[in-house]
């Protein structure tokens, strides 16, 4: 772009017809050097910013910088099971993720769920007696799992009128930390609104060495 500073790598020199020195510059070489330098800084567990570029059924692709694309698999988006990555993120959304794996071909796999807190950290944000909005994630014979935070879901009584993805209002009947269970009561199943929880980060920088959801 005119007027914008740009990096190049000098690959050689020559002379023009008047004898003046002409420098042979490569923008591509500068981009490769930038990419390699950036990759050298990335380690498994590193928390980095990224931007969602496109979404597939199996995950979301993200730009992690210097034009480097990484995969955020659907099962790494949160502890709660979702039908599609689009239930959690949108194209253009900026995220914080941790590097789950980087192989010898510099293919990078990301994870988001480890940054969204353990069961205890999420449960501490709620209290029995509250009424909150949740998203139905699974309807089973023995009950309905309803997400009240990306890494936290509770169980309500069976209800065949509910379906995955439905937004409902729920009353928190009890929170049982020793059993890691939350009992919910659906109080309004007709909210008629599509909802997606925004990420609530419990980790925003540094490097993850280990993570146990049940702690």
Where are these regions (language model features)?
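Single-stranded RNA-binding regions, centering on S1/OB-family and related RNA-binding modules
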Residues: 1-215
